[in-house]
């Protein structure tokens, strides 16, 4: 008997669950009212409705250059709200998330790093109409002429290419420079190609499937005969950010030899983009917008832990928000009255931000969760992580969410799942949670031990 073994696919990968994998949107109805449990959110109705209004303002392009502050205690869903805003806006609107401490670097100034992220959050949609000739090559004849410089040699004056589609055929008389592109692509009769009328670039799509019965040593990609006319107009839409344009102009392309490539690899410092270069890019962008070729899309810059910024960054942020090209800035802070970095210790400010910036912000408050809401959040996370939790264990975890923190309660899920499997159970029980409590300390118990042992474990 012939043995047949099934080959298992080794490429399939388990999807990793991050802290905010369960967030799918703000969970609002058609009237903008928050549903109690929707889109991965539980509660926080006022904050979600406020964010829904902000999303509508962003979509109608009436929010650029304004800033929002998400203020609330740790573990109340500030980062989740910012992530939900980005998902409501969709993939076409740029969303740039950063943490306050990311801006401090030895290579680049903090204000330059802040401006770089500002430019990353502003998109440019460029619409271009291209005239294209597409079809199967039925004729390829270069026409020669006498060399104008004299001598016996001849030069190619033009090339005649016949293209065929399902609707008809066309004969094109092309420039000799296009013939060079045809030779580079190794185009022969029977190939399907397309030629861009504006640039003259030639692309070989593949071999026509009419020749699929031919035997060839080289593996060919056979494509069907193009439909429609030979001459077509295609509208191509490209989405880029202003930072992409800055980088493209800041790094001029060197030669293709080994020395220049090695020189680019061994550059010790990051290239700092100057204000002059940015203003030149802005001029070109404004010209494109005036011509109707491009459209500016203000995105979202999310700065988490905004209290980590210093007074210089805040001063720069004030100026950047008032510039003509600015994204929507969403800030998040879990501090109350605290000192601003880079100022005197005795001067305290709300949320760690200066008073003049606070005046420019729309503040959205997030509230702590109650036990019932924590229960729903834990059960949702358990479902996402393919864990079954008994009602007793769920009650115990929700108490941890109230007494300690929601994060601690959620972090106990995975180790409790391992302990239940070790014990031969399919579901997490209260015994597993109790064992996890002994093995893993929460912050309060850890602080108490440190106080009792006078700084030593």
Curated annotation (Swiss-Prot):
Its EC number is 3.6.4.12. GO terms for molecular function: 3'-5' DNA helicase activity; 5'-3' DNA helicase activity; ATP binding; ATP hydrolysis activity. ATP binds at residues 72-79. It comes from the Eukaryota. It catalyses: ATP + H2O = ADP + phosphate + H(+). Keywords: Activator, ATP-binding, Chromatin regulator, DNA damage, DNA repair, Helicase, Hydrolase, Nucleotide-binding, Nucleus, Transcription, Transcription regulation. One of its GO terms (biological process) is chromatin remodeling. PANTHER family: RUVB-RELATED REPTIN AND PONTIN. May form heterododecamers with RVB2. Component of the SWR1 chromatin remodeling complex, the INO80 chromatin remodeling complex, and of the R2TP complex. Belongs to the RuvB family. It is found in: Nucleus. The keyword Cell membrane does not apply. This is RuvB-like helicase 1.
